[in-house]
Swiss-Prot record:
Membrane topology (Cytoplasmic): 1-25
Function statement: Cell division protein that may be involved in stabilizing or promoting the assembly of the division complex.
Keyword Magnesium included in the entry's annotation: no
Similarity comment text for this entry: Belongs to the FtsQ/DivIB family. DivIB subfamily.
Membrane topology annotation: Single-pass type II membrane protein
Protein name: Cell division protein DivIB
HAMAP family membership: DivIB
Transmembrane segments: 26-46
Source superkingdom: Bacteria
A biological process term (GO) from this entry: FtsZ-dependent cytokinesis
GO (cellular component) term, any one: plasma membrane
């Protein structure tokens, strides 16, 4: 009886050894097949694709436009997104000149979050009965609006593209508080100064300046206007001086502007 039990144990041990040896031999084959099967199951599942795309930070460009421009959409394979979010964000940024920066990241495993920063509007160009926004980058948006926002000047009478670009370049140098009190900037050349511009201020003062220098000189405007007792014409073409705006039966007295 004891011999039979011993033989049974020996047979059981040999069988287990046989199983272990076979498992060890087959493991190098089973492991890759298992991985391949898991990958295939993942690829055909909904978890392998972008579930949702959200947009934030935009004010002018709509969510719908950004999603349409984006190379990543709902249903895009995650294999096309992993490790490529910076490149994809840069591709999206190039689709609209209004976008100053774009950041893209994956959240909650398969959701894409797009954060946009837009170039702000700093003025408008009047053209053919409409107003084209001028961005902080200097770019003029071709799409026109009928009612420009208050607090931004309108550029008028600029037929020469080069002079317009120079004017915008100088205008961008002016501090935002001064920009906010500029109503219009009109190209107003003379024989003696082919680069002269005329600026109508919201406080009623009028300014004449040169394209090449008004970007720096206009920042002195608050100091100059604070010394004026009446609405005046301020000339910043050469130096700085002012005189009251001419009215009927009123003599025009030239006043030197101090502090510039």
């Amino acid at each position: 009886m004891g011999a039979q039990d011993q033989n049974g144990k020996n047979h059981g041990g040999l069988f287990r050894d046989f199983q272990n040896r076979n498992v060890k031999k087959m493991w190098p084959l089973v492991m890759p097949i298992t991985i391949i099967l898991l990958v295939m199951i993942f690829m055909i599942s909904s978890y392998s694709r972008v579930k949702k795309v959200t947009v934030s930070g935009n004010e002018i460009v709509s969510d719908q436009q950004i999603k349409a421009f984006s190379p990543v959409k709902k249903g895009t394979s995650l294999f096309a997104v992993w490790g490529k979010t910076d490149k994809l964000a840069q591709s999206l940024k190039q689709r609209s000149r209004r976008m100053q920066s774009v950041k893209m990241k994956l959240v909650n495993f398969n959701q894409v979050k797009i954060k946009v920063e837009e170039y702000p509007t700093i003025g408008y160009l009047f053209v053919h009965g409409g107003y084209q926004p001028i961005l902080k980058s200097g770019v003029i948006i071709k799409g026109k609006v009928l009612n420009p926002k208050a607090g931004f000047p309108v550029l008028k009478k600029f037929q020469n593209p080069k002079k317009l670009r120079r004017t915008i370049k100088q205008y961008r140098r002016i501090s935002p508080p001064v920009r906010a009190v500029m109503n219009t900037i009109s190209f107003s050349p003379t024989k003696s100064n082919p680069d002269r511009i005329f600026i109508q201020m919201s406080d009623g003062n009028k300014v004449y300046a040169s394209i090449s220098t008004f970007g720096d000189k206009m920042d002195y405007y608050p100091s100059i206007s604070s010394k004026l007792k009446v609405k005046s014409v301020i000339n910043l073409e050469v130096g700085a001086y002012s005189y009251p705006i001419p009215q009927k039966q009123t003599s025009t007295k030239t006043t030197s502007v101090q502090g510039y």
